[in-house]
Regions:
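Long, hydrophobic/aromatic-enriched structural stretches that serve as scaffold segments
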Residues: 74-98
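Short glycine-/acidic-enriched loop or helix-start segments at secondary-structure transitions
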Residues: 25, 93-95, 122-123, 143
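Conserved anion/nucleotide-ligand pocket segment
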Residues: 130-168
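Gly/Ser/Thr-rich loops at beta-strand to alpha-helix junctions
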Residues: 20-23, 87-92, 112, 117-119
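ATP/NTP phosphate-donor binding region
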Residues: 1-79
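Short, acidic/small-residue loops that bind anionic groups at enzyme active sites
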Residues: 99-124, 130-137
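Short, surface-exposed connector motifs at secondary-structure boundaries
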Residues: 12, 77-81, 101-107
Length: 168
C-alpha cells in the first residue's frame, strides 16, 4: 500500500461530491463557504472545488460519470495534494464503471470521507493507496457556529494527514 504524502500549509485540496450532491443545493450551499473558509484559515490549505461538486442533488445523482470524472481529474492534477469528500450519500457505487485504478495508483493523494464514501475507500484500496475514513466537508467542516475542537484535533493530530506543524 502506498501512503500519500502528508499535507502541509499551502497545499491544494479538491472537494468532490462522489455520492449525494446536497452541498450544492440552495439550502445547504452556505455550509460549503463555511467549510472552505475553515479549511483555508484553520488548516492553511488552498481549496478548489471540482466542476460538478456543487451542481446540486439532482444533477449529481443523474451524472455518476461526471462525479467520477471530477475524482479522476483531481487525481491527475499534480497541484492537488488531497481530496476531501463533500458528504456521503447512497449511490457512489455507480461511479465504479468510470474509475481508472491506474490513475489513482500512479498519483497517490490524501483521500478523506465517510458514510457512502466507503465505496470510494474500497476504490483506493484496490488502487493500492491508503485512504482516511474521516470528516466530510459539509458536516464536520461546514457545520455549527464553531468547528468542534475534537474535529480539529483529530484531523491535525490523530489522522496522519498533515506534516508536523510547529510542534502540534
Amino acid at each position: 500500500m502506498i501512503k500519500p504524502n502528508a499535507l502541509k500549509k499551502g497545499d491544494k485540496i479538491a472537494i468532490v461530491s462522489l455520492s449525494w450532491g446536497g452541498l450544492g443545493d440552495a439550502g445547504l450551499i452556505h455550509k460549503y463557504y463555511i467549510a472552505k473558509d475553515r479549511l483555508e484559515k484553520d488548516f492553511g490549505l488552498t481549496v478548489v472545488t471540482m466542476p460538478n461538486a456543487l451542481k446540486g442533488t439532482d444533477f449529481v445523482y443523474n451524472h455518476p460519470e461526471l462525479r467520477a470524472q471530477d475524482l479522476m481529474e483531481a487525481f491527475c492534477d499534480k497541484s492537488i495534494k488531497g481530496i476531501f469528500c463533500a458528504i456521503g450519500g447512497s449511490d457512489s457505487i455507480r461511479l465504479l464503471p468510470y474509475i481508472d485504478y491506474d490513475v489513482i495508483h500512479d498519483n497517490p493523494k490524501i483521500f478523506m470521507g465517510y458514510s457512502d464514501t466507503t465505496v470510494s475507500h474500497f476504490v483506493m484500496r484496490k488502487a493500492g493507496i491508503v485512504s482516511y475514513y474521516g470528516p466530510s466537508v459539509m458536516c464536520e467542516f461546514g457545520e455549527y457556529v464553531k468547528m468542534f475542537d475534537y474535529t480539529k484535533e483529530a484531523v491535525e493530530k490523530l489522522y496522519p494527514l498533515f506534516s508536523s506543524r510547529n510542534g502540534s
